[in-house]
């Protein structure tokens, strides 16, 4: 039987935030947890299905692969129904979601410790040329940096954090509620197991300070709007020396005056005179790497597409470049002199004297209109 869509399993939108996904998984896991549904095989199957979906969508890289390629993009990366199906197989993910609810049931009964820094997101606007060729860009990010005075510990110089007496350094306290042992973060130390009695004067005991830092971002050739670049450890600094989060740079490519992009292909409109369209000729067509010659055959109609192979965009993950699609647009002459207008009238008369052979499309259209009204 084919797998259900992971977003459908969790009942979440495809653009759901990490917090929304966590809430959705928590709700389902509470409902179908084996402790609440003993000997219920259907509930266990749904619990495993929700766990598998959340394992993938909670991981930024796995989620990106799933969004692009579906289940094929995350096959073999864990999270299958058979992986960790035993009583101890719910592991880290279950402990992360339910460590503060079910005491030890999910293997997450250890001390939580200081919180990892938050991930940051930054939208970087690029020109089409920058996106196609790649570039190095400098960006400025307002963030939390590790405190230089206490080196992230949060404690005043010469002092150390002390063990929390409420939880004995475990970071969690337990309470009995009916059939369940409820395990919660210690309210005194906020789950860290340590208390800072003499806080650092520079950071107020947080171990981090607000700052604006400048980063250099290497943009690979071929990126497009919506692509993300992950800079590991460049997010917010964690509290009390915890690891920093990551920075995700979101690419946004500005509109171009000439080209439109569709995947690896480029599209542009090429204006030509009706003389060139009628008699044929050669035109200079712009590409991102300079001009090329485009041969226009005689009797070319407006709207005709010409494909210049290999003149598009090289894929960001390697491979042959796309194509440049040139749409010919016949331009009507303007600001004509009296003499030019007279020449055109004579030219029109010569066309009409030749019967239908000079304008077959026009005559076919009028014939179609005539048949349409004749049937009314």
Swiss-Prot record:
Its cofactor is Zn(2+). Zn(2+) 2 binds at residues 164, 167, 186, 189. The keyword Transport does not apply. Residues 5-70 form the J domain. The keyword S-adenosyl-L-methionine does not apply. Binds 2 Zn(2+) ions per monomer. GO terms for cellular component: cytoplasm. It is found in: Cytoplasm. Zn(2+) 1 binds at residues 147, 150, 200, 203. A zinc finger (CR-type) spans 134-212. It comes from the Bacteria. Its main location: cytoplasm. Keywords: Chaperone, Cytoplasm, DNA replication, Metal-binding, Repeat, Stress response, Zinc, Zinc-finger. Pfam families: DnaJ, DnaJ_C, DnaJ_CXXCXGXG. The J domain is necessary and sufficient to stimulate DnaK ATPase activity. Zinc center 1 plays an important role in the autonomous, DnaK-independent chaperone activity of DnaJ. Zinc center 2 is essential for interaction with DnaK and for DnaJ activity. Belongs to the DnaJ family. Homodimer. This is Chaperone protein DnaJ. The gene is dnaJ.
């Amino acid at each position: 039987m084919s797998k259900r869509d992971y977003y459908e399993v969790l009942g979440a939108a495809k653009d759901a935030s990490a917090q929304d996904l966590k809430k959705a998984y928590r709700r389902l896991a509470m409902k179908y947890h084996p402790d609440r549904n003993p000997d219920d095989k259907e509930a266990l199957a749904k619990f495993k299905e929700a766990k598998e979906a959340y394992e993938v969508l909670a991981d930024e890289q796995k989620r990106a692969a799933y969004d692009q390629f579906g289940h094929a993009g995350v096959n073999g990366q864990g999270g299958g129904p058979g992986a960790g199906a035993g009583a101890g197989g719910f592991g880290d993910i279950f402990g992360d979601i339910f460590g503060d609810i079910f005491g030890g049931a999910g293997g997450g009964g250890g001390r939580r410790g200081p919180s990892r820094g938050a991930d940051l997101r930054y939208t970087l606007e690029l020109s089409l040329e920058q996106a196609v060729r790649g570039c190095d860009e400098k960006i400025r990010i307002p963030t939390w940096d590790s405190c230089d005075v206490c080196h992230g510990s949060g404690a005043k110089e010469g002092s150390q954090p002390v063990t929390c007496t409420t939880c004995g350094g475990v970071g969690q306290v337990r309470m009995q509620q009916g059939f369940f042992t409820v395990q919660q973060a210690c309210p005194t130390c906020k789950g860290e197991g340590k208390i800072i009695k003499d806080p650092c004067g520079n950071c107020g005991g947080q171990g981090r300070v607000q700052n604006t830092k400048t980063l250099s971002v290497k943009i690979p050739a071929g990126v497009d709007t919506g692509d993300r670049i992950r800079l590991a450890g460049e997010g917010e600094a964690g509290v009390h020396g915890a690891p920093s989060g990551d920075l995700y740079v979101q690419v946004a490519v500005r509109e171009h005056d000439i080209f439109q992009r569709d995947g690896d292909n480029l599209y542009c409109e090429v204006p030509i005179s009706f003389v060139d369209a009628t008699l044929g000729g050669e035109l200079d067509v712009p590409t991102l790497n300079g001009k090329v010659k485009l041969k226009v055959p005689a009797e070319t109609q407006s709207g005709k597409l010409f494909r210049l192979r290999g003149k598009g965009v090289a894929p960001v993950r390697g491979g042959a470049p796309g194509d440049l699609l040139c749409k010919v647009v016949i331009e009507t002459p303007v600001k004509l002199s009296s003499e030019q207008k007279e020449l055109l009238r004579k030219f029109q008369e010569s066309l009409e004297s030749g019967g239908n052979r000079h304008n077959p499309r026009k005559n076919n259209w009028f014939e179609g209109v005539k048949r349409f009204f004749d049937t009314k």
